[in-house]
Amino acid sequence: MVIGLSHYLTVSAILFTLGVFGIFLNRKNVIVILMSIELILLAVNINMVAFSSFLNDIVGQVFALFILTVAAAEAAIGLAILVVFYRNRGSIAVEDVNMMKG
């Protein structure tokens, strides 16, 4: 059995759906929301690499590496902000984060 484009798109659609459900169904934990955003970015990367490989073009794969770099930086900065917020407030609930003054 050959793994084709439709298999990659199916896996990507499942990951994207899990990420969207994670954001909409969990409104209390910021870490789970951050992980759901990472799942969505991973699904987009799988799509880009699958189409790039299917079309024999390297540009999509290079762009996917840039997206992974941005996602890693976003996760690191987001977790650092959450650690500082937890030290100051003692909680990382979404309701507490919404009360921040800007």
Curated annotation (Swiss-Prot):
From the record, give the transmembrane residue ranges.
Answer: 5-25, 31-51, 65-85
Gene Ontology biological-process entries = ATP synthesis coupled electron transport
Q: Does the keyword 4Fe-4S apply?
A: no
Q: Does the keyword Cytoplasm apply?
A: no
Per its record, the protein catalyses: a quinone + NADH + 5 H(+)(in) = a quinol + NAD(+) + 4 H(+)(out)
Taking the first listed entry, what is the main subcellular location of this protein, grouped into a coarse class?
membrane
InterPro entries in UniProt: NADH_UbQ_OxRdtase_chain4L/K (IPR001133), NUOK/Mnh_C1-like (IPR039428)
One Pfam annotation reads: Oxidored_q2
- The EC number(s) given in the record are 7.1.1.-
This molecule's function is given as:
NDH-1 shuttles electrons from NADH, via FMN and iron-sulfur (Fe-S) centers, to quinones in the respiratory chain. The immediate electron acceptor for the enzyme in this species is believed to be ubiquinone. Couples the redox reaction to proton translocation (for every two electrons transferred, four hydrogen ions are translocated across the cytoplasmic membrane), and thus conserves the redox energy in a proton gradient.
Q: Which HAMAP family match?
A: NDH1_NuoK (MF_01456)
PANTHER family documented for this protein: NADH DEHYDROGENASE SUBUNIT 4L-RELATED, NADH-UBIQUINONE OXIDOREDUCTASE SUBUNIT ND4L
Q: Which family does it belong to?
A: Belongs to the complex I subunit 4L family.
Q: How does it assemble?
A: NDH-1 is composed of 14 different subunits. Subunits NuoA, H, J, K, L, M, N constitute the membrane sector of the complex.
Q: What is this protein called?
A: NADH-quinone oxidoreductase subunit K
